[in-house]
Amino acid sequence: MLTRKQYELLRFINERLKEAGVPPSFDEMKDALDLRSKSGIHRLITALEERGFIRRLPNRARAIEVIKLPELGVNPGGGNGRRGFTPSVIEGNLGRVRPAASLGGDDDSGRTVAVPVMGRIAAGTPIEALQTRSHTISMPADMLGSGEHYALEVRGDSMVDAGILDGDMALIQKNDSADTGDIVVALIDEEEATLKRFRRRGASIALEPANAAYEVRILPPNRVRIQGKLIGLYRKY
């Protein structure tokens, strides 16, 4: 389990390593996370190291190695990661897309689509389903692809190890079915909505969190209705 700041720092270090070949300085980390002092960065680095996400190399300045990322295998850049959602994130303050994988062609490059925001979704204990359209957000058409889409504001931290944070806007493609491993909007007993990973277990359905602090829910199919699949995230800083 990672906190929001731990996740943001891990991602920042990994991106800098890929771009420049060296990790950022502590001052750069402090500025990137908008912290007042480097002591906060030291605590975050220690927490990431204790959880096995990074390794500090001895006797070398600014020597940090990323060992793994949430929902990926041991090598973040390799092909041995286990199957799962790696979110495409639109960063609201920068106005650019950071795709985890290509989600569409180039025909719609530059075009945006108004996506209705339908309320909140629990990434934690299921909350009552909300059906009220409050407003819209503009999304790149080539990120959304085909089909109908809507957005839900994430509440809770049960999917944090999949890179889905409290306060994110989840971009959902409408769908009434799912494959094992998909992250879905699941409506339970026609009254509670939750964002979880979908798996079939024999004749039952498992709704799995991506946070060890939460339990997997095993339910009969007649109690679960799929309302869409997660395809991306919109995040403001």
Curated annotation (Swiss-Prot):
EC nos = 3.4.21.88
Q: Where is this site: Cleavage?
A: A123, G124
Please report the name of this protein according to its UniProt entry. LexA repressor
Q: Which GO terms describe its molecular function?
A: DNA binding; serine-type endopeptidase activity
Q: Which family does it belong to?
A: Belongs to the peptidase S24 family.
One Pfam family of this chain:
Peptidase_S24
Q: What does this protein do?
A: Represses a number of genes involved in the response to DNA damage (SOS response), including recA and lexA. In the presence of single-stranded DNA, RecA interacts with LexA causing an autocatalytic cleavage which disrupts the DNA-binding part of LexA, leading to derepression of the SOS regulon and eventually DNA repair.
Q: Which residues are listed as membrane-spanning?
A: none
Name the UniProt key words of this record, in alphabetical order.
Answer: Autocatalytic cleavage, DNA damage, DNA repair, DNA replication, DNA-binding, Hydrolase, Repressor, SOS response, Transcription, Transcription regulation
- Which regions of the protein are recorded as binding DNA? 26-46
Q: Which InterPro entries match?
A: LexA, LexA-like, LexA/Signal_pep-like_sf, LexA_DNA-bd_dom, LexA_repressor, Peptidase_S24_LexA, Peptidase_S24_S26A/B/C, WH-like_DNA-bd_sf
* Record-annotated active site: S158, K196
Q: Which residues form a coiled coil?
A: none
